[in-house]
Amino acid sequence: MNNQTNQQSQTQSQSQQRINFDITGWEKKSKLSTQQYLLINNLNKSTQEKPLPQKYLEDKINNDIKKEENQQLQQQQQQQQQQQQQQQSPIIENFMDNFNPKTDIDNLSDFYQWYSIIDKNNPHLHQYEWFLETIVNYSKGSNQLLSMVENCDKLVESIQTDYSNLTKKTNQLNEDCEKFFNEELKLRYIAQSIHDKLKFYNQLEIQTKKFNTTNFNVTDSTFLTSLENLENSINFMKSNSTFMESNKYLTQYGFIFSRALGLIKDYISSNLKILSRDIINAQKQLKTSVSTPTSPQLQSSSGGSPLINDFSNSTDFNDLFQHSNIRFRAFAPKLRPLCLELEKRAIGPYLSYLYDTQNIYFNNRRSILSLIMFEKLQSLSKMTDISSMIRSSSLFMIQFYENEYQIYSNFFSPPDLNNNNNNNNNNNNNDNINNSTNINNSNNTNNNNQDIINNCPAFSNILDEYSQQLYDTIRPIYIHIHSFETLCNLAHLIRNELIDDLVQKSMKYSNGFKMTIERMLQDIQERLIFIIQTYIRDEIRSYHPNSDDLDYPNKLKIYVTAESTAVDGDGNGSGNSSPTLSYKSIYSTWYPTLEKSLTCLSKLYLVLETRIFEGLAQEVVEACTFTLIQASRLLLIQQKNDPYIILDSQLFLIKNLLTLREQIAPFDINFVIIEKIVDFPNLKHSLSTLYNVGSFLTLSTNNPILSLLSPRVTNTSIDSKKDLEKELKQSIESFILSNANTIIDPLLSLLTKISVFLNQSNKNQTDPMLLSQQSFADPQRIKEIIEQVKEKASNYLPQVIDRMKLYLSISTQILLMKPIRTNIIDSFDQINQYTKKYYTEDQIKIIDLQSLKLILDKILTPSKQSNNNNNNNNNNNNNNNNNNNNNNNNNNNNNNNNNNNNKNENNENENENNSNVNSPSPQQL
């Protein structure tokens, strides 16, 4: 019974569990169908879409349509779901119908009966039981899994908590380690820094002991290292002046550093003195060996100082000079490192050690070279040719400069003397001395140090001394020269050879040689100006000609004869004609003052400044013109018996003035000087008005006191070239008028009488036709006068033409003869006009005026042969003039020839264009 009871209780419990199972809830928990998922997705998409803008309204309408379609699909899906539920609901209803008893259960049999009915009617409930059991098992497993997950979660949380705690502790440990490591590094750096800084403090005792010992000197192997340590210590103390007792240590280090540099200076000084003493002793031995009585050459020399005898020949000088150079070059590698150490540290007060060392070096070189230089310059000063002496001396000085530069470069850094400025160096030194410990502490200091090393004033000073010695040796020689040609050659040599060539080579060593050469040039130019002014006064303006100087036209005839002989000799192939003879011949035709003036100008043109040359050229041209005029007058006085002396005098003046004008044309200068003259008459008037007391009170220019305090000064310009043109024009006009009047003088008197008669007839109102009845105007009388004119023209004009051929060129002859012919023809034209107006045809035939023109044309028109001869003579004259220019002015050959050719061409053109001018201008000639 108990078993049955248990079974019934179990059965009831199972039935209760079945009754409590809600199948509707399970259906709700079941998965959705595919259509349902699609519907949900469509709804999700529609909710995720953002509203469109107003401008896309049409798209929105389309979307609404799509929404309606989706709603329809949803309704269809809902209907399908309802149908499915309806399919399932009969099972549930049937189950519920079976489950609910139709009759009441009163006893156990009713229960079993009801149960059997349920069991029969619902056979598929076993499947649900199995499924329920499975679900229950899954639920238990899930619960167990959840409990395990919870345990794992708790375990993970505990692990995470432990890990975070461990991480914090590890990070803290790492930070602490890094902190301790950084502190360790910092302490080590501080310790090392302290050690490094203490090293400079500890060096003081070490260096003090080292430099105080007697065994420590410059030759010690550790000397340079100690010097660098001292320099580093000084730089450290200077850059860390805030450290304790840094100034004290800086001062002590400075004393030790100065002592070290002093040791270097003393060592170099002692070695250089020993070297110089050995070289001087060697020179004395060589001097003694050369000066022994066994040398006949030296026995004849004059006595004097034992160190200054005649051993200045080239062999002795070269031996001494080369011996000293070789010894210094061989000794340089020993001292050069120490000299470079001084140059590196030549800053502030330590610059004096470098300067002292350089001065010691130059003093030793000076003691060796003084005797050698003196003897060499004395030997050069004994040369007879001053130009060769100056050239040789300059070449020697350039070689000497180069040699000294190379020797100096073997000891010290090579100086760059092109940028040498002693004043700037002195200023830099004073600024640096104020800073007692400034050693290599900035880039600017390094630059200044390099500038000081490159700019060596002592090197320039010693070269300047020897340049001054050269100047003192040569100046007494050229200052006593009285020949201006020699002075011109010297000035030309200095300007064109020495300054342009040698001086440029010496500029990289010293400016002293350039200054010396320029001083020499200035002295020579000053001496030359003085000599030229004396020469102008004594040799040109005050020149007194002798009889040979005024032997004209014989000098010209001799020249023409010599030229014709030379031409004939060339034509016969003899080849005996000499160009030098031709040059001397053309010079012999010039008046001496003309030759001297042109020689003076050509020499001065290239050696003086333009401003100075213009003033001297004006004086020379004015003096030469004056002497030519005086010579033409003396020619008239000395040769009174010559009937053609007036003609010779005029042609002499024209020829020489033309030559002077032609020869000064190539000089591109202004022959004008401006003189300031005080108006002394005005001063005299002011002094005379001082007695008028009332005039003192006038506030005007008439006040005598104001006139005395501010005298009137007038500027007067003197143009010698214009004066020359004026004199030339006057001489040409005088020549033309005198020669024309000489021929037509009777005709001119006749014309004067005719003009007087016609004027009287006009006043008296008489018949002018009575002119032919006058005794002075009788046709026969006029014919006699014309015959006289013809005779003079036939006799006098050929003489004039012959003289002109001697003096002038063919082009100048034509220019001068045209106005003479024109004046003669004009006078005859006036007679012809009078005869046509006041004479009958028969009377005109008696007078016969046309024959005079034929005679003039025959006389004044030269033949072809004479033209050829004159052209040859003219060409020879031009060539000789050009050669004269070449000899007198070496650098203006092309200019003179071109100017002469241009002048001849211009003269020919002007001759053609001015054939109707009565008197030609000087420019036409």
From Swiss-Prot:
It is a peripheral membrane protein. Transmembrane segments: none annotated. Residues 71-88, 418-446, 867-904 have a biased composition (Low complexity). It is found in: Golgi apparatus membrane. Keywords: Golgi apparatus, Membrane, Protein transport, Transport. Residues 68-88, 416-446, 863-925 are annotated as: Disordered. GO terms for cellular component: cis-Golgi network; Golgi membrane; Golgi transport complex. GO terms for biological process: Golgi organization; intra-Golgi vesicle-mediated transport; intracellular protein transport. Pfam families: COG3_C, COG3_N. PANTHER family: CONSERVED OLIGOMERIC GOLGI COMPLEX COMPONENT 3 (PTHR13302), CONSERVED OLIGOMERIC GOLGI COMPLEX SUBUNIT 3 (PTHR13302:SF8). Required for normal Golgi function. Component of the conserved oligomeric Golgi complex which is composed of eight different subunits and is required for normal Golgi morphology and localization. Belongs to the COG3 family. This is Conserved oligomeric Golgi complex subunit 3. It comes from Dictyostelium discoideum. The lineage of its organism: Eukaryota, Amoebozoa, Evosea, Eumycetozoa, Dictyostelia.
